[in-house]
């Protein structure tokens, strides 16, 4: 099933929905970072959440960054997303892996940890970005985001995120949804949706059966006048470049850069998001010193 993200409403706008299949997107992120199974599930859930939330941005220049740091062996997960559905991310420890939890599922909470915070950072080109922060609720990511929306944005929300890792460590299925009750929505409607979400199969199970994201949402919102508003293709895409890495190298400061120039013949930097390596020769480091600090 091809990746697809849709935005929809139900019950005459009382409910706002963003849903997506993200199997290929997550597969690419997991491949780039060579993740162990539990790390793959954690990164995949965050990438899916980022893709969903990024589409709420107003401008293509805006960015949304999700960070979760719970003190666990995952060493944090960071994802940055954009309005057009493209997303990038990394996990601090891609080899993080532990035994399944009591339900036989990959123990994402176990590697994330619960001693920390979930941050949502919206950079809309203003002087300061908007930063929302809540304590980690369960470490399962979906429940943490639902808690964030309810506490930080006062929007009752249900967030479902799923990643099914195959035996060969590829991603068999991945996807998710964010369901939000709009101001003035019928409380009984919220109860009905909550009941349905408890009764349905997992989103990865539905994707594995070949259901499209539209069919999944139709199944959840049967008899609720689901109205699909728009659709896009979410994608894992890193926008790193040699120029950006050069600026990052220059930003460490004149003193540290001079030490590198004096001590090494070559400096290699890797992009956090895609692991692409950029090598700078001794002469190139000297040129950076000269162009940024008029020193060599």
From Swiss-Prot:
It is found in: Cytoplasm. One of its GO terms (molecular function) is protein folding chaperone. GO terms for biological process: protein refolding. Under oxidizing conditions two disulfide bonds are formed involving the reactive cysteines. Under reducing conditions zinc is bound to the reactive cysteines and the protein is inactive. It holds the Pfam family HSP33. Disulfide bonds join 238-240, 271-274. GO terms for cellular component: cytoplasm. Keywords: Chaperone, Cytoplasm, Disulfide bond, Redox-active center, Zinc. InterPro entries: Heat_shock_Hsp33, Heat_shock_Hsp33_C, Heat_shock_Hsp33_N. Its main location: cytoplasm. Redox regulated molecular chaperone. Protects both thermally unfolding and oxidatively damaged proteins from irreversible aggregation. Plays an important role in the bacterial defense system toward oxidative stress. Belongs to the HSP33 family. This is 33 kDa chaperonin. It comes from Clostridium botulinum (strain Kyoto / Type A2).
